[in-house]
């Protein structure tokens, strides 16, 4: 699986076991990602932070 790093078009190949790409952003600024990368389990959203997870190449 290939996931974008914080600044596309840069990306990396995920290590074994991390089969999701994710994008983390603040609820107040959804168009400005705070973090991007590979993850094993999609974290739960909170009141301030949301996560978008997906499992196809460079979908984050």
From Swiss-Prot:
Disulfide-bond pairs as recorded: 3-21, 14-38, 42-53, 54-59
tRNA processing found in the keyword field: no
GO molecular function, one term: toxin activity
Domain of life: Eukaryota
Keyword Secreted listed: yes
SUPFAM superfamilies given in the database record: Snake toxin-like
Primary site of residence: secreted
Tissue-wise expression: Expressed by the venom gland.
Location in or out of the cell: Secreted; Target cell membrane
Protein name: Cytotoxin 6
UniProt source species: Naja annulifera (Banded Egyptian cobra)
């Amino acid at each position: 699986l290939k996931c974008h790093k914080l600044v596309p078009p840069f990306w990396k190949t995920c290590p074994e076991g991390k089969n999701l790409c994710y994008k983390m952003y603040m609820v107040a600024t959804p168009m400005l990602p705070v973090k991007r990368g590979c993850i094993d389990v999609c974290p739960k959203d909170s009141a301030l932070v949301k996560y978008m997870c997906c499992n196809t190449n460079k979908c984050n």
